[in-house]
């Protein structure tokens, strides 16, 4: 079964410096029908204006992954980490027992557009940590590239949860197979462009839950970027 989550149905807020869209309930946006999906708790699509951002704030007991679509995002945290995240880079932060961080647009002239994903950890009280990995365009082009996994397989960032996240940049007419083991579920988030899934076209910002489907194909209708979640 494929259940669509159209972009226009998400929670939407424009704070001037930040335009944000919430796939699942987050902050002031509460929808009992969309509280998360298995271990996947948050998919926020954020656009932040030049030189603006999120001041220092705290998190606990959450796996937080950031995937930048355009621009550059500057990160600082209480572990002493300072990094800039750009397209093709996966950043993960395990909040664990507590971490404080800030995120600002690294550019004074261009906006930054990114997805921030929260995944419930397998257990609480983990030691906070940070990791960041760069993936070449060739590794993402017309294939699903594992970017996050519970064991850090294939050079992906490690998640403390039985969840695997893959990314792909697809040229028009190219497709990638989707396969989920028995008892697992999938979620597709279209970051850019348009793709066909199970006879339905999904556009940028759209998402789809996949349950009880062992094999599907994801085909690009236009130049596209997608994230695919494989969830326990």
Describe the function of each predicted region.
Residues 1-232:
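Jelly-roll (double-stranded beta-helix
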């Amino acid at each position: 079964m494929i259940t669509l989550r159209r972009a226009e149905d998400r929670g939407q807020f424009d704070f001037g410096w930040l335009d944000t869209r919430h796939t699942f309930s987050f902050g002031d946006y509460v929808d009992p029908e969309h509280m998360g999906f298995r271990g996947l708790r948050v998919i926020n699509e954020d656009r932040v204006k030049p030189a603006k951002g999120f001041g220092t704030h705290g998190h606990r007991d959450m796996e937080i992954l950031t995937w930048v679509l355009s621009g550059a995002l500057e990160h600082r945290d209480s572990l002493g980490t300072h990094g800039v995240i750009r397209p093709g880079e996966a950043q993960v932060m395990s909040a664990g027992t507590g971490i404080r961080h800030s995120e600002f647009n690294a550019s004074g002239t261009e906006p930054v557009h990114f997805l921030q994903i929260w995944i419930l950890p397998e257990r609480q009280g983990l030691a906070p940590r940070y990791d960041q990995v760069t993936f070449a365009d060739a590794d993402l082009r017309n294939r699903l590239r594992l970017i996050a996994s519970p064991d850090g397989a294939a050079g992906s960032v490690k998640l403390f949860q039985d969840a695997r996240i893959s990314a792909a940049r697809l040229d028009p007419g190219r497709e990638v197979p989707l396969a989920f083991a028995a008892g697992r579920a999938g979620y597709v988030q279209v970051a850019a462009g348009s793709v066909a899934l199970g006879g339905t076209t999904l556009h940028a910002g759209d998402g789809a839950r996949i349950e009880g489907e062992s094999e599907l194909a994801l085909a690009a209708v236009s130049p596209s970027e997608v994230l695919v979640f494989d969830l326990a």
